[in-house]
Amino acid sequence: CQNQKNEWKETYHLTYFYLKDCSNCQHFKKNVLPAIKKEFGKHMKIKSYDMDDEQTFDEMKETYQNHIDQIIDFDEDDYGYGPMVFLEGYMAILGAGNEDDYVEHLVNAIKGEKLNEAAEIETYYYLKDGKVQKS
């Protein structure tokens, strides 16, 4: 039985914030990002921000704050943790579990389908103007 390949027409935007020494961020970069690229190809524009980089710190902090401000009921205890991933206009996910499941979260969000349960390490966040709303 073959996995039905999705045909993406639009371009989506993913913004993520990471820390160099965070093992889950490394897992996201090494395993999850390639899986996202494989699924979406050129239809997913990805922008990353290193939360440790002093040279881009001010720009990163402003962008991070703007993104956090879009979240409904953000848990301040999660502030500054990574990987913090925003599927622009849809939702945000803090933490990354299995890469295939993660890609499925994004696919379901974009298609407007019910999200699978988040992995233990993941937290779904909903955006004030996001297309995905808490069910």
What are these regions (language model features)?
Residues Y79-V132:
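Non-catalytic, surface beta->alpha helical segment in thiol-disulfide oxidoreductase systems
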Residues K61-M91:
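Short, structured active-site "lid" loops
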Residues C25-F40:
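Typically the conserved alpha-helix immediately C-terminal to a functionally engaged Cys/Sec
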